[in-house]
Swiss-Prot record:
Keywords: Cytoplasm, Methyltransferase, rRNA processing, S-adenosyl-L-methionine, Transferase. Specifically methylates the pseudouridine at position 1915 (m3Psi1915) in 23S rRNA. InterPro entries: Alpha/beta_knot_MTases, RlmH-like, tRNA_m1G_MTases_N. It catalyses: pseudouridine(1915) in 23S rRNA + S-adenosyl-L-methionine = N(3)-methylpseudouridine(1915) in 23S rRNA + S-adenosyl-L-homocysteine + H(+). The gene is rlmH. This is Ribosomal RNA large subunit methyltransferase H. It comes from Methylobacterium nodulans (strain LMG 21967 / CNCM I-2342 / ORS 2060).
Length: 162
């Protein structure tokens, strides 16, 4: 199963980028043995349109173009629902075992995501009700992806309740 993180905007150098790379490397180290590819990170340019609806539409089209065909789509959205790490691992494992060719996780731009992206989502996911900086969301997404891998592998990293 191909793994992709699609994000609007570029992550600058700094502690967030270092953490993103740390968790990406950890996930990649477990991926092959679990039937996953290395995580491909795609950074999309932010729209320069003047109006927010136009920016949202441009970014939404770019996001959908970047998602590999047939992939399960997890969309990070403030209106999404929180999901436990175990439930996320179960869902990712079910998609993999059910023959989905890929999993794409999407982080939108500053204006959020247009409805066409949300409608395409298999899961609208939120880390909670708080608004978080995009760099931090990337860190959290990659940490959760690594945690999913450890849960599927039976690795002791995840010590939450079964």
């Amino acid at each position: 199963m191909r793994l992709a993180l699609v994000a609007v905007g570029r992550l600058k150098r700094g502690p967030e980028r270092e953490l993103v790379e740390t968790y990406r490397e950890r996930a990649d180290a477990l991926a092959r043995g679990l039937g996953f590819s290395a995580v491909q990170v795609t950074e999309l340019a932010e729209s320069r349109a003047r109006r927010a609806p136009d920016r949202c539409a441009e970014e939404g089209a770019a996001i959908l173009d970047a998602v590999p065909p047939g992939s399960a789509l997890v969309v990070m959205d403030e209106g999404g629902r929180p999901v436990t790490s175990l439930a996320l691992a179960e869902q990712v494992g079910a998609w993999r075992d059910g023959g989905r060719p890929g999993l794409a996780i999407v982080i939108g731009g500053a204006d959020g995501l247009c409805e066409s992206v949300k409608r395409r989502a298999d899961l609208l996911f939120a880390f909670g009700a708080a608004t978080l900086p995009h760099g931090l969301v990337r860190v959290l997404v990659l940490e959760q992806l690594y945690r999913v891998m450890t849960i599927l592998a039976g690795h002791p990293y995840h010590r939450g309740a079964p």
